[in-house]
Amino acid sequence: MAKKLVRFDWAMKRILRHKANFDILEGFLSELLGEEVTIKQILDSESNKETEDDKHNRVDILVENSKDELVIIELQNSNEYDYFHRMLFGTSKAITEHIKEGHPYAEVKKVISITIAYFDLGQGKDYVYHGTTTFKGLHKNDVLTLSGKQVELYKKDNIYEVYPEYWIIKVSQFHNRVKDKLDEWIYFFKNAEIKNNFSAKGLKEVNERLDEIKLNEKDAKEYKRYLKNLRDIASEQHTKMADAQDLIKKGEEKKEIEAVVGLYENGVPIPIIAKSLKITEEMVIQLVESQINK
């Protein structure tokens, strides 16, 4: 049986910000981005400014890697309809806050935004999405590229490397079918466990350091409280969804009653009403009588 590990979002808040645990985040980023990633430092992020209402709902961490790129890793537990706008705001904020006043635009840092979403963000069949910026010709359909001088100055080969890059991992869309090493990480995000045959970078360290039974008494209590808050959020969302469905059902029932009574008052025979609305004749009689006896 796989050991019980702490959730990645809680680990991001409490454990992964320490330099001794950078190798865990480095492992995840290396598997996602397909290159070796070294973390230089953890920078201040929005998590430190969150309110009591949303601190259990969202966790984010801002990383600077050895290539001087900024990497925003954000984990979101529940739905926000304007979340795509939030992603844009986050990358824009990171750019403006990390360029010194009076310095040239060429010093604008590349930003990589990674969202680990535990809700159905947008509409799509996949569970990992990657977004970049390209410029395509309106008439020739060619892709705009950097000049030789720009490649030399920016140390980049393509225009999209200058602009923010977005990754979205839809954990709720992942069906536990592991096909590669990135899937091993997503399996951990969803299930808080690691299978014995997993070999993705960083997961060995996760297995060693994020073991739930290794938490000290204070952290164990806080972690239990954190899980309870997540359950409360999930329960509240379930209740809202059920209430919405009830309202829809009541609206449909009201329309059905109005249709039955309207047809009856216009002299349409009960058998024809029943056949037209695909209900029984007894139901038609009950609905008509319920309105007459009001």
Predicted regions and their residues:
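Short, charged alpha-helical interaction segments and adjacent helix-coil junctions
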Residues: 71-76, 180-294
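Conserved single-residue anchors adjacent to enzymatic active/cofactor-binding motifs
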Residues: 1-220, 225
